[in-house]
Amino acid sequence: MKLENGRPADCSGRLPKEIRTYDLLDSLGVAYQRIDHEAAMTMEACAAIDEVLDATICKNLLLCNRQCTAFYLLMIPGHKTFKTSVLSKQIGSSRLSFADAEYMERFLDITPGSVSVLGLMNDHEHHVQLLIDEDVLKGEFFGCHPCINTSSLRLKTSDLMEKIIPAMGHEPRIVDLPLSE
């Protein structure tokens, strides 16, 4: 695995949603590095990728309330454990659970294993509220998928907050989730 600058030189065979991700980043003047790899479905499978990226690798979780009327995309450092009750209390929501794959595809054009903050570029009607754990913001860089799980990106955290999220029209809410005991 090798870290490359920017989009692939040859995008043939790549999915349109991946190419749209590169188009967005390029249009914003965001510098990024990319690594191509086998499908990474779990945080454990991302260990070797993490080493090459040298960035805060985030778990990106699509959550919803019991009625499936409120949806949240949570960015949390990979080493933290997600506790539903803690987050629910912080955001004043009823009990949260993982959203079904149908909502990932409908709102973010993403499938399980590929959930990424960059999928918010497809949420034109703002069905999903972005939640970012404050520890994500402490690193200079963070890693995420370009809406597919066979590549990973290394982006500046400042670019996420100052360029990417504003361009997608979402307002993040910062949360503070404790390390598991």
Question: Model-flagged regions — what are they?
Answer:
Residues 1-181:
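Extended, low-hydrophobicity, polar/charged segments
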